[in-house]
């Protein structure tokens, strides 16, 4: 589908994945090499100011402390789950707000990734966002559920509040070898973080399941059709395996339902006597399927130095789907939203469009 003459062409890319794989460094390296000319490229870092200093407490530190207190038997699983659910909702809020700020200004998709013809080349604005709401609302809660830190009730509640993706939402899931991933986490040593290899294994599996879920759904997969073939998920078995091995669920070209996020969501408390989900849980699973199906999910291996990873990221971006602005002033409004997000939610400067760039849009 080609754009209308004169409409703005916008590329939005969300670089996501387990913490510590190097996604932020890769995105920053990509944007740093760009000259300040059209297309304007803006990098929105994780909203650390919102998470760590906007309110009275530091959410990052609270998350690690809660997990540590649970592991030390200082609090119960129910208490930890209540804390974690609140914190995950807080972590996802900036992304949900950004989506709603952009929603009126994002129009139709200009090309499908599987088009036979060339993708549109002109890009007026390239927006790279460090993470997407799916991280805080799906992947991290699910990883903590697999570790026994939050209940499926909490996971279901968060999934049900995942915002509908905007057209042209390109989600790039970064990955890395397990040992290199652990080494990078040890090296970065962010304030408040605790190295937890079991949690690292859980979040790696959650993101692999996310990528497999997208492939499963886009190839015609139907969770209702395949539900009967799934075994009941046992978090304790997952934790025992993750604690002993560096196993990560493989990314599959033709995944089955057992390779997807749905595999961790079949637990007895939400099933009827036949083993099928009760209505409310089924609706939650439908929301998950609809949200993930609407995303354009890609994977990117970040093995190697930042410059090489940035080059691989650039090559991937060349084939991603674009959208057009929904009205003549859309490009200016999107730049303003990006600038406000960077200014108020990031600790250090994401590259904001300058005043001159915004006014010239």
From Swiss-Prot:
Coiled coil: none annotated. Pfam families: Herpes_TK. SUPFAM superfamilies: P-loop containing nucleoside triphosphate hydrolases. Its EC number is 2.7.1.21. It is an enzyme of class 2 (transferase). It catalyses: thymidine + ATP = dTMP + ADP + H(+). Homodimer. Belongs to the herpesviridae thymidine kinase family. This is Thymidine kinase.
């Amino acid at each position: 589908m080609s754009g209308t003459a004169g409409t703005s062409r916008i590329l939005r890319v969300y670089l996501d994945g387990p913490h510590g794989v190097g996604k932020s460094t890769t995105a920053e390296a990509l944007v740093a090499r760009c000259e300040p000319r059209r297309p304007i490229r803006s990098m929105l870092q994780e909203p650390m100011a919102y998470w760590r200093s906007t309110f009275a407490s530091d959410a990052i530190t609270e998350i690690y402390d809660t997990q540590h207190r649970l592991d030390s038997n200082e609090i119960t699983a129910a208490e930890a789950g209540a804390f974690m659910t609140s914190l995950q909702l807080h972590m996802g809020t900036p992304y949900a707000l950004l989506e709603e700020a952009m929603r009126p200004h994002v129009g139709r998709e200009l090309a499908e990734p599987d088009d036979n013809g060339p993708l549109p080349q002109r890009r007026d604005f390239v927006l790279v966002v460090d993470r997407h709401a799916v991280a805080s609302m799906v992947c991290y809660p699910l990883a903590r559920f697999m570790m026994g830190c939050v209940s499926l009730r909490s996971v279901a509640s968060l999934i049900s509040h995942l915002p509908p993706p905007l057209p042209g939402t390109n989600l790039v899931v970064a990955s890395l070898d397990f040992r290199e991933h652990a080494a990078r986490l040890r090296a970065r040593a962010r304030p408040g973080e605790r190295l937890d290899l079991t949690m690292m294994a859980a979040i790696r599996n959650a993101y692999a399941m996310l990528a497999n879920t997208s492939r499963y759904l886009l190839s015609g997969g139907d969770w209702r059709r395949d539900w009967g073939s799934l075994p009941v998920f046992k978090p304790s078995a997952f934790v025992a395996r993750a604690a002993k091995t560096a196993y990560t669920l493989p990314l599959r070209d033709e995944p089955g339902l057992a390779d997807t996020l749905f595999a961790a969501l079949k637990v007895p408390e939400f099933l009827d006597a036949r083993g099928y989900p009760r209505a409310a849980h089924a609706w939650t699973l439908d929301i998950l399927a609809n949200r993930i199906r609407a995303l354009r999910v890609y994977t990117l291996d970040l093995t190697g130095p930042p410059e090489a990873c940035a080059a691989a990221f650039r090559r991937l971006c060349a084939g991603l789907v674009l959208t057009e602005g929904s009205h003549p002033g859309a490009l200016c409004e999107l730049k303003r939203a990006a600038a406000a997000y960077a200014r108020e939610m990031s600790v250090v400067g994401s590259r904001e469009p300058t005043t001159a760039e915004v006014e010239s849009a």
